[in-house]
UniProtKB/Swiss-Prot annotation:
Keywords: Meiosis, Nucleus, Sporulation. GO terms for cellular component: condensed nuclear chromosome; lateral element; synaptonemal complex. Residues 569-584 have a biased composition (Basic residues). It comes from Saccharomyces cerevisiae (strain ATCC 204508 / S288c). Probable constituent of the synaptonemal complex during meiosis. May interact with HOP1. Required for meiosis I chromosome segregation. GO terms for biological process: homologous chromosome pairing at meiosis; homologous recombination; meiotic recombination checkpoint signaling; reciprocal meiotic recombination; sporulation resulting in formation of a cellular spore; synaptonemal complex assembly. Residues 364-373, 381-391 have a biased composition (Acidic residues). This is Protein RED1.
């Protein structure tokens, strides 16, 4: 032991009841290495085995100091602290009033986010119970030096173990006057607020001379600091088993049946508090955490208990010596699910948990005067563009490093992301000045609201030119030039379009649009409809209103490419699908009555057939008999018939219907071109009607033989045909209604049955998969993980043995590598 002391500390420290001395004199620590860690572990192991009692705080100070430095160097230190917590102290040990050992332990113990803080407090707790004279010194250190730091720790406490030992120390140093009383003899000023100190120490759950891990201590922490304690849960029941499948579970019981258990996952370890002595410390890498079908969490040990779990309670370690796993039942199932999710989703090293808030990005003030000044600066930069030199562009930019704590006036300022980026001010196109033509007429369709322009001004984030780099300024000037050039091109295009629109207006007035919706498809002849006066003026007026607008489809498409997205074709496809559905539904109709003759007549047609690629609608047309050309009066009457349906057309006499039987002729496909429909209709003396218009025109003054009965119907229209026997249509409608009801009911019944069977299949499959397959594959995956872990461990061991093979000849080296096996440590 003496040799180990000299290797570790540089001097041979004595463990005797000596007088107080300078505890740090003549000792200088060098770089901590793995060898130092092993030597200290061996030294502490000998102290524990030989049951040595610490009689000098100088030795304890250097042991704690070296252990903390080894931990800070990320060297293996768990076993070192395990042996430190098992050290025993003499009750006659000499303690100075300003003991550096206790001060150092307190300072390290109340540090936040330190994995060994609670272990330093555990050492103080052990000294407090073993050395009676230490209580006065610890109380004085807390009041004078560490009170404020303890208050800050409780405001942000995360470690349940640290809180347990700290509350134990406080409850023994600042006791209640009685177990049932709320008064404390002397309250330390942990916070500046008296009410906060009073609430902490005079709380009904504040323990009376408690021990760490007791029910009072844990309840006090959970009731007051549960929101800050990370990954902490309260358990109702803890069971353990000696089998790997956790069968034949045994329930862990205390003397007091009302006690609860507490668990926390922190610093890549799991701490389970079962009694008042010490927690069970599980190594996260050496256990596997799962959940069974009853939502109970299971902790399975990958290795023997003493290799996976550490505890200073010898009786507890002896009880669980042959344990292979634990089963935990939480008081709150939701809390258990949260704990299970957090334990199995530990943040990786590369995962971002915090971020810095930059406070030097300021929004542009809303004052208009300041905006004008900023615009003036931009214009000055544009004029001085040619005067910039390469030396200015090559000068390094030095940006000040700001504090990560934002100021009050910039609390809500965020960095500009690509989705929220503001466009350059020069990208705002003033189309209002371009919408006026030469005659002063304003295009009605081009209206840009001022709200959009104001929104851009308020959202615009200004960055001062002093903070910009020359490269960024040059790029912004380039973008301004490009946008200005684009605006000039757009203005020229609008001027050219205005000239073309005026020429189109004159042509349209000379050749008015001939509306042919009043043409009626009759039996086999066409006659000139009744003349109506004063139609030319109406047609010219309508044409002027329609042609007055200079906006065409091409102009709208240009604006869509600038400000919006290309028009979707869903609407056209929807109309086509709707027409197809109507066609399919009505062409399958079969009337009940017998019609003498429904054969389609082969009629001639002088109308040219349009190509199918630009098909608009399908109409039923009859052969044109008369060769007369339609006059302007006829065209005028057609326009009138399209706008208003007359009362004479709606009231058709039954006598006329009985004498004249219009035949259902074959429908012909007629297409319409947007640019040439009016000219071709006038030359060929025929009309093209939209499929959505259905009109009937029959002059009541003339006989059926001398008139033209016209029915403009869709290809899917059902004509009310009358048989010679005079059967009526209501019977036919009743039959179709009943047939539709039967079809609907049968389809509805079939769909309901199908949905019910599918739901049954889903439920049964889910149950079968959860019960039978989940446990099977969980076991397979766990075995796979174990095998993979064993193989990797064997590979690491083999890599460590390579250095011993460097002295072998080549043949023996190849033979040794090839014969090496990674199964059960066999070669």
């Amino acid at each position: 032991m003496e040799g180990l002391k000299k290797k570790i500390f540089g001097v041979c420290l004595k463990n005797d009841l000596a007088q107080t001395r300078n505890e740090t004199k003549g000792i200088h620590y060098g770089l901590m290495t793995l060898e130092t860690s092993k030597q200290l572990q061996e030294f502490l192991h000998l102290l524990v085995i030989k049951r040595e009692v610490i009689q000098n705080f100088e030795l304890l100070f250097h042991i704690i100091n070296v252990a903390v430095k080894i931990t800070d160097s990320n060297l293996p230190s768990d076993d070192i602290w395990h042996f430190i917590l098992k050290l025993r102290f003499s009750s006659e040990i000499n303690i100075d009033e300003d003991s550096k050992v206790l001060n150092y332990l307190l300072e390290t113990g109340i540090a936040m986010e330190n994995p060994v803080s609670w272990k330093c407090l555990a050492v103080i707790s052990s000294i407090l119970s073993s050395v009676p004279q230490s209580k006065k010194i610890i109380t004085n250190l807390i009041e004078t030096e560490h009170a404020k730091k303890i208050g800050q720790l409780f405001d942000n406490i995360q470690d349940l173990q640290q809180g347990n030992f700290l509350v134990e120390i406080l409850s023994n140093c600042f006791k209640k006057s009685a177990s049932n009383s709320k008064k404390v003899e002397k309250i330390p000023q942990l916070w500046q607020s008296r009410s906060k100190n009073k609430f902490f120490f005079e709380n009904e759950f504040y323990p009376f001379s408690s021990k760490n891990g007791s029910l009072q201590t844990c309840q006090f922490l959970c009731n007051n600091f549960m929101s800050t304690l990370s990954f902490t849960g309260i358990l109702r029941q803890v069971s353990y088993s000696g089998s790997e499948t956790l069968k034949n579970l045994r329930i862990f019981k205390k003397k007091d049946d009302e006690n609860s258990y507490f668990i926390q996952c922190i610093y890549n370890k799991i701490y389970l508090w079962l009694d008042e002595k010490a927690p069970l410390e599980f190594e996260r890498k050496k256990i596997r955490i799962t959940k069974n079908l009853k939502n109970k969490i299971q902790i399975k040990l990958r290795q023997p208990f003493h290799e996976c779990v550490r505890t200073t309670a010898d009786k507890t370690a002896l009880l669980f010596n042959k344990t292979k796993g634990f089963q935990l039942e939480f008081e709150d199932e939701k809390l258990g699910e949260t704990f299970f999710h957090n334990v199995n989703n530990i943040p990786k090293i590369s995962e971002v948990q915090n971020f810095l808030v930059l406070d030097y990005i300021e929004e542009e003030p809303e004052n208009e005067g300041e905006e004008e000044e900023q615009i003036g600066r931009a214009d000055e930069q544009k004029e001085d563009e040619e005067e910039e030199s390469l030396d200015e562009l090559s000068t390094p930019m030095v940006y000040p490093i700001k504090s990560s704590i934002p100021h009050n006036h910039n609390e809500k300022v965020q960095l500009v992301t690509p989705d929220r980026s503001v466009s350059i001010r020069s990208d705002e196109w003033d189309l209002k000045s371009n919408t006026e033509d030469e005659e002063g007429n304003v295009l009605a369709d081009l209206k840009i609201s001022s709200t959009k322009e104001t929104k851009r001004q308020t959202d615009y984030v200004h960055i001062d030119s002093e903070d910009q780099s020359p490269v960024v300024s040059a790029q912004m000037r380039k973008m301004r030039r490009e946008s200005t050039k684009t605006l000039e091109i757009l203005r020229q295009e609008f001027k050219d379009k205005d000239v073309q629109n005026k020429e189109d207006q004159s042509e349209q007035i000379q050749n008015p649009f001939v509306n042919t919706s009043s043409l009626v498809v009759g039996k086999s002849c066409l006659v000139n409809p009744k003349e109506k006066p004063n139609i030319d003026q109406t047609v010219v007026g309508i044409t002027e209103l329609k042609s007055n607008s200079s906006i065409k489809k091409r102009d709208i498409n240009i604006l869509d490419t600038i400000f919006g997205q290309p028009p979707s074709k869903k609407q056209k496809q929807f109309h086509k699908k709707e027409k197809k559905k109507q066609q399919k539904k009505l062409t399958n109709f079969k009337p009940i009555i017998d019609v003498p003759s429904q054969d389609k007549r082969n009629l001639r047609s002088n109308a040219p057939t349009k190509p199918k690629s630009i098909k608009v609608s399908k109409l039923r047309t009859d052969k044109k008999v008369t060769g007369e050309k339609s006059s302007p009066e006829t065209a005028a009457e057609k326009v009138d018939d399209q706008t208003v349906r007359s009362n004479d057309e709606q009231a058709m006499s039954r006598a006329t219907k009985e004498k004249c039987f219009p035949d259902v002729n074959e429908g012909k496909e007629i297409t319409k071109d947007d640019a040439k429909v009016s000219l071709e209709s006038k030359k060929n003396n025929e009309t093209f009607v939209d499929s959505s218009v259905v009109e009937k025109h029959t002059p009541p003054d003339k006989d059926c033989n001398n008139c033209n009965i016209t029915d403009i119907l869709e290809s899917t229209t059902v004509i009310d045909l009358q048989s010679p026997h005079g059967l009526s249509a209501p019977g036919q409608n009743t039959f179709t209604n009943k047939l539709q009801e039967q079809i609907y009911s049968s389809i509805n019944h079939f769909s309901n049955e199908l949905v019910r069977k599918i739901s049954i299949i889903n439920q049964e499959l889910n149950k079968k998969i959860l019960k039978e397959l989940s446990e099977k594959y969980q076991k397979l995956f766990s075995e796979l993980q174990d095998n993979f872990q064993n193989d990797t461990n064997e590979m690491l061991k083999f890599m460590g043995e390579i250095k011993d093979m460097m002295n072998l000849p080549e043949d023996q080296l190849v033979h040794a590598i090839r014969t090496r096996k990674f199964d059960n440590n066999k070669r």
